[in-house]
Amino acid sequence: MAGKARVHELAKELGVTSKEVLARLSEQGEFVKSASSTVEAPVARRLRESFGGGKSAPAKGSDTGAAKGVAKAPQKVPGVSPAAKAPDRSLDAALDKAVGNGAPAPVPAPAPAPTPAPAPAPAQPADSGVAPPAATPAAPAASAAPAPPKAPLPGQRPAPTPGKPAAPQAPHPGMAPGARPGPVPKPGVRTPRVGNNPFSSAQPVDRPIPRPQAPRPGAPRPGAPRPGGASPGNMPPRPGGASGGPRPPRTGAPRPGGGRPGGPGGGRSDGGGGNYRGGGGGVGAAPGGGFRGRPGGGGGGGRPGQRGGAAGAFGRPGGAPRRGRKSKRAKRAEYENMQAPVVGGVRLPHGNGETIRLARGASLSDFADKINANPAALVQALFNLGEMVTATQSVGDETLELLGSEMNYNVQVVSPEDEDRELLESFDLTYGEDSGDESELQTRPPVVTVMGHVDHGKTRLLDTIRKANVREGEAGGITQHIGAYQVSVDHDGTERLITFIDTPGHEAFTAMRARGAKATDIAILVVAADDGVMPQTVEAINHAQAADVPIVVAVNKIDKEGADPAKIRGQLTEYGLVAEDFGGDTMFVDISAKQGTNIEALEEAVLLTADAALDLRANPDMEAQGVAIEAHLDRGRGPVATVLVQRGTLRVGDSVVAGDAYGRVRRMVDEHGEDVEEALPSRPVQVIGFTSVPGAGDNFLVVDEDRIARQIADRRSARKRNALAARSRKRISLEDLDSALKETSQLNLILKGDNAGTVEALEEALMGIEVDDEVALRVIDRGVGGITETNVNLASASDAIIIGFNVRAEGKATELANREGVEIRYYSVIYQAIDEIEKALRGMLKPIYEEVELGRAEIRALFRSSKVGLIAGCMISSGVVRRNAKARLLRDNIVVVENLSIHSLRREKDDVTEVREGFECGMTLGYSDLKEGDFIESYELVQKDRS
């Protein structure tokens, strides 16, 4: 046949079935899908050679078609060369040896004689209709029926009947030892070829013999009857299946099977249809070795519950299983789910103690992404534990750690400092270290922070040093922001630079003082000689000592009456500041900032301390790093940040990032208002060019590109929002649900200030006001700069009050506020704002009502009226009873009903407002369950002032 040929045409040409051709092609390594598929000419030639050239088609029988499905003779057997075209005596010897080695064969059952095929075939000691011997028995099979079975239909295998084991037959003379006698061969029956029938258990010997496998757990013992009573042999015959030809026994050693003989999956002895739990038993198993088995090498039998494709259907060698075998990962996941902990009634993933790092303010969705879990399951678990949290809501650190411990995870909440360091490391950036070696470090000026109690003369001291007047520009005469200045002093004939940072002394500016202490090298503690040590003085000492900063004490106002510098030295001894006069190491200088007394001595003390105790060096050749000590929004210049360069040199045009703000340095201005092209270490400058206002105390650093600065700022902004949401979220448990659902008063505020530090201090001071649980204070927005229309619209939508600190509203914003009815309050001194907000919160408290008893009345008679209902005739036994007053009904000194109201009150025929003790009256209560002898107790609620 020239060109391509179809499988069924080749089968017709060779005189075999299409199924046999497909099986032979599969043995040769050719994958052919169906009988209508085509094969190449070389493949067809090899196929014809494997069948020994063309063979005549068998004649169709008149009464049966059994000969049509008879298997062909085997191609390869042990000891026979592949070129052999027909089996010889060596085949019989090999088969007898295999049978003699202990391969049991079932007892032959009578079957109708098939019509002999006209083609001659060698005689084989087998009978048509007899099942071939079992291939993989675990024990000698004994499954013969006690009675002769019913003869099967033509082309159908006989069904073995479960019951008593059949008696062994006597062997014929000349048979090999251990071999079973077979029926007399019938002439004309075609000999099946080994490996040609996909349903045959006898396969080519060149396939590797599978290793013995242990019986499958739970499988029936070998030789036992099939569960359910139905035998696989009763199933209808397969299309084209061999039924009339004899089947030789499987060559090779028997395989131990699990379940039934025929394979680990409990296959039949003939390897054909009817295998209950199919599957070839391991590597190199017979194709189609089971009704539902996998063709070819299966992996140890079918998985319990898995249904494989039917072998040999429509001429196919066997289909793949309907569902793929589960991988080890899927099985492991199922096992872990079985072992998963149950938290709050919800099954959650089970960890192995690994560490999960989460940022502060992370949500349950973030946690679920880390552990590959469903966020809804975590939400349900927390809800069942009494914690109501959404999947995207920020969760506190304790909740995350508790939930992680329940699932065997070690949750670590990363601190903001560590998270920021990791963020910078992801961009190959480091903060806080000088690059280069020791030879590149140069001496820098000391940074000095002036600290102390309010009104003790800190700003006046700086004014005297700078020969300026900053104090008069501060509202209320108190410093409300940080000022940074650099002055030049003459020390031993050498010009030296000193950077001064002025911090507020008011109690509301604790955060500012802490930032000033962290950014400084030396702290000057100003104490008034006539006032002594005050609370903010102690707080300043604590900040300086916590930052490990040396302290120089300036005893101010020594020119005033009542000044006692010795007393100050004695008081500060309690806090570890021992003067040099008393044998300590702290330098005390008595000064008068107003008169300018001993200012040079104070500067000299600062320089001596810096030279003796500190190593003030930095690398000016690296990219600049420092801290933003203050920031504000200027109307004409935009965001302006006062930065202190600590390392490197800051130049105009550098890309900088400070906290969640970024930008490019457009302009730098010093404390005198003059432009600066570059700022060396320890130099404070005002930087113009940020896209937003940086936070006071944020670290700034120079990066290579604007893109990197924007990415760092965006990530910091997202982290800041999450942390703020986690901090502001109020935890509501199920026990507190009733109280949480009750109506509560809340004062919403929008804060606007002239600089970031003032806004931060004002917010912390306002949030620290404690009035009562019934009222709450909420800051819904905060910002630096004037009050805009956007602020007014937000306040109108949220019923908020706008607080302006040293800022005013724009013209259109004022008109919009008047039109929308939004209240704007302006303040210039911080404690005035705190006092007024506290009074407003107290005014929002619900009033307290106190019950005052008025009198009691006894019901003597009852009268019914069609107009007003039931009328109670009463005698006032004590006090007075008023109309429209509250009342309760008592019966046998037990309260029957509360919160009644006296609708009408009559004395004889006149309506009266009240009736006093000893008089009779009639009254209606709007209540019908009244009895004679009941008492009516009248009272009223009087509002009580709340402190």
Curated annotation (Swiss-Prot):
GO cellular component terms, A-Z: cytosol
Comp. bias regions, Basic residues: 322-331
Composition-biased stretches (Pro residues): 105-123, 146-171, 210-225
Ranges for region G3: 502-505
PROSITE patterns: G_TR_2, IF2
Bias kind Basic and acidic residues: ranges: 86-95
Chain positions covered by the region annotation G2: 477-481
Biased composition (Low complexity): 131-145
A GO molecular-function descriptor: GTP binding
Keyword Protein biosynthesis: yes
Binding site for GTP: 452-459, 502-506, 556-559
tr-type G domain ranges (all copies): 443-614
Chain spans, region Disordered: 47-332
Biased composition (Gly residues): 255-318
Cell membrane is among the record's keywords: no
Protein name: Translation initiation factor IF-2
Encoding gene (name): infB
